[in-house]
Amino acid sequence: HWIGGWIWYYIQKANRENFLYDLYDIDGGNIQYTHYYPGDYYTWHIDGDISTTFKPEIKPGTGENLRDDQTFHKGECVRKLSFSLQLSDAKDYRGGEVEFINSAGERYFAPKQKGTLIVFDSRTKHRVRTVKSGLRKSLVGWVVGPRWR
């Protein structure tokens, strides 16, 4: 789908300008649609750490599902980057902010403007605060790469 290509383009741009991580592709080629109604939230968590390893279900760099053992990527992978694409207009809901906290305890909020793509290190602690009214919609996913060196 075109949206996956668009997201991948900006993930690579963010990676070049901010992280310089070795990346394969979006985890499993999957992007999740999420929605939060009033009262919904997601508590503090991280999406990956140095021990999160698994075999991807996609051919690196293509997004194609792998069917045969000859083309299956044999190495272990880790989630390195996470992303969220804001689908709702900020005026359509209250609350639901994506909040980050760094190791010094400083907190930051992601922009809520519709169309904003947030790309961040998967080891960053974050949450979605409680939606107070309206509906918050987003696309979220994770980017995998080889084990950390």
Regions found by a protein language model. Give the residues of each.
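Fe(II)/2-oxoglutarate oxygenase catalytic core
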Residues: 1-117, 123-149
